[in-house]
Curated annotation (Swiss-Prot):
The keyword Cell cycle does not apply. Its EC number is 1.1.1.-. PANTHER family: OS08G0158400 PROTEIN (PTHR32448). Glycans are attached at residues 41, 364, 503, 508. The modification Pros-8alpha-FAD histidine is found at residue 110. This is Berberine bridge enzyme-like B. The keyword Ribosomal protein does not apply. It comes from the Eukaryota. GO terms for molecular function: FAD binding; oxidoreductase activity. Disruption phenotype: Strongly reduced nicotine biosynthesis but accumulation of dihydromethanicotine. Inhibition of jasmonate-elicited formation of anatabine and other pyridine alkaloids. Mostly expressed in roots. InterPro entries: BBE, FAD-bd_PCMH, FAD-bd_PCMH-like_sf, FAD-bd_PCMH_sub1, FAD-bd_PCMH_sub2, Oxid_FAD_bind_N.
Length: 568
């Protein structure tokens, strides 16, 4: 159990005062400050090609998951710092402020737009990498756990499974994803229809703010505690630890992988029925879809005589035995024709491995659950993602439009995540994540390619943007919803002169109002009616905008009328 320390005070008085004054001084100043305050685990950008160069780039690349941001021309951090304790984390924040370095916080490095390891505003910046702060402490008596902000989702799952086979946590399927960022943005996963998001199951947190204070839920206040659950990472401070609620699951669950390749017409018919059925299934049953263009030998028919144009993969998790899965699916969705050999019974932790990138296309993973602790992910690639929410059933013509656009790009994917269940029952203002009742499913558009295809990156980027525009009539509007954990810079970015409030003298209410209104363009897509409350929370916890990125929430230093809109 982590102690609930409200304020760390250990000879940092002078450092804190210097930091808030914006003293500056460059990398030498930062180096001296870190060493003086017992922070030794860091790597400085190399000025020559030697061992330090190798160490720096190995560290930079280790958790850099989107290779779009690994190119040599991309901005690089001056220093990469790996704090080993909360004391070192506090010192790191204050030293970075003293030396006037922008802070980018990295947990697992899965930011869709690289915001945890790249800064495009021209300021010198550092990466504060939390990988050394990855302890998970489980307390079965209270059915809670403390997970440090650098722990991955896989590490949390593994720690729970080591002490219980009937407890779980509701989060995503990527085991190498960092909990600090994932939970900050909401954290949707296969248990969300049953238990809500990861952030819905946070009962306390330890946040280190820009002044080096370590704040628990009571100390930060309910407005900030509300904001850090679903309001997006990189905004409020650095999450030192989450206290999460453990969730009861049966000893045996059932997983299914169901492949139904065929013509666009055939797949569209399945999807039309799927969108009606899945939001209304029992909460214990989640049935998602992964879609990609068919890239198969002509003689591979998969028992289907129709031409293979689209390759859909239906992924199911049911909190119960296989017999019930088959009964429910064949009663509610007979068109899918789920077969006995397409489903397997296993423990919940085995299902986490089954649906992870550690398994092959058929879900085979050797059942070695210790692999969930691995931080490094093989097979990294280049990718761009976008998201949508669907509130009304998509017509047959609409589904065909989806598939026609998908077929244009062999590097493209679609992911349909079903809503309903607990996602309908939890109030849309319970936490900062707002996409609740009224959503049938969420869409993730993905273009993913390898290095040998990177010369065509502009083609892939143009494709996904065109796809997104084509889908406008079929998805939510006023505003068009988006998921903050799938950041999309196409929606807009903060302007340098608006959001870089580097010190007190640069503040003025007019520019802050402009910044807040500019950010509303994408802020309301991510947060709907919760945007203004997030601005208030940001102003309360980080008025100088120390923790920021290209789509962070700006603080309000003046006053303005709350914006009104209607969500359709």
């Amino acid at each position: 159990m982590f102690p609930l320390i409200i304020l760390i005070s250990f000879s940092l008085t002078s450092l804190s005062a210097t930091a808030t004054s914006g003293a500056g001084g460059g990398v030498a100043n930062l180096y001296t400050c870190l060493i003086d305050h017992n922070v030794h685990n860091f790597s400085i950008y190399p000025t020559k090609n030697d061992q330090s160069s190798s160490n720096y780039f190995n560290l930079l690349d280790f958790s850099l998951q989107n290779l779009r941001f690994a190119a040599s021309y991309m901005p690089k951090p001056t220093v990469i710092i790996l704090p080993n304790s909360k004391e070192e984390l506090v010192s790191t924040i204050l030293c970075c402020r003293q030396a006037s370095y922008e802070i980018r916080v990295r947990c697992g490095g899965h930011s869709y737009e690289g915001t945890s390891y790249v800064s495009f505003d021209g300021s010198p910046f550092v990466i504060v990498d939390l990988m050394k702060l990855d302890e998970v402490s489980v307390d079965l008596d209270s059915e809670t756990a403390w997970a440090q902000g650098g722990a991955t989702i896989g590490q949390i799952y593994y720690a729970i499974a080591k002490v219980s086979d009937v407890h779980a946590f509701s989060a995503g399927s990527g085991p190498t994803v960092g909990s600090g960022g994932h939970i900050s943005g909401g954290g949707f996963g296969l248990l969300s229809r049953k238990f809500g998001l990861a952030a819905d199951n946070v009962v306390d947190a330890l946040l280190i703010d820009a002044d080096g204070r370590l704040l628990d839920r009571k100390a930060m206040g309910e407005d900030v505690f509300w904001a850090i659950r679903g309001g997006g990472g990189g905004n409020w401070g650095i999450i030192y630890a989450w206290k999460i609620r453990l969730l009861k699951v049966p000893k045996i669950v059932t997983t299914c992988m169901i492949y139904r390749p065929g013509s666009k017409q055939y797949v569209a018919q399945l999807l039309q029925k799927w969108q009606i059925v899945t939001p209304n299934l029992v909460d214990d049953f989640t049935l998602g879809v992964l879609l990609r263009p068919a890239d198969l030998p002509a003689d591979m028919k998969y028992g289907n005589s129709t031409p293979i144009e689209i390759f859909p993969q239906f992924n199911a998790l049911y909190l119960g035995p296989k017999t019930e899965v088959l009964s429910i699916s064949n009663e509610e969705f007979p068109e899918l024709g789920v077969k006995n050999d397409e489903c397997k019974e296993m423990t919940w932790i085995e299902s986490a491995l089954f649906f992870s990138e550690l398994a092959d296309i058929n879900g085979n993973s050797s059942n070695d659950i210790s692999r969930l602790k691995e931080r490094y992910m093989d097979g990294k690639g280049f990718f761009k993602g976008k998201t949508d929410y669907v509130k009304k059933p998509v017509s047959m013509d609409g589904m065909l439009t989806f598939l026609v656009e998908l077929e244009k790009n062999p590097k493209g994917y679609l992911v349909f995540d079903p809503y309903g269940g607990a996602m309908d029952k939890i109030d849309d203002q319970a936490i900062a994540f707002p996409h609740r009742k009224g959503n049938l499913f969420a869409i993730q558009y993905l273009a993913q390619w390898n290095e040998e295809d990177d010369y065509k990156s502009d083609v892939y980027m143009e494709w996904i943007r065109g796809f997104y525009n084509t889908m406008t009539p079929f998805v939510s509007s006023s505003p068009r919803g988006a998921y903050i954990n799938y950041l999309d810079m196409d929606l807009g970015v903060n302007m340098d002169d608006d959001y870089l409030l580097r010190n007190a003298s640069s503040r003025n209410s007019s520019s802050s109002v402009d910044a807040v209104e500019r950010a509303r363009a994408w802020g309301e897509m991510y947060f709907l009616h919760n945007y203004d409350r997030l601005v208030k929370a940001k102003t309360q916890i980080d008025p100088l905008n120390v923790f920021r990125h290209e789509q962070s929430i700006p603080p309000m230093l003046g006053s303005t009328q709350e914006h009104k809109y209607s969500s359709e």
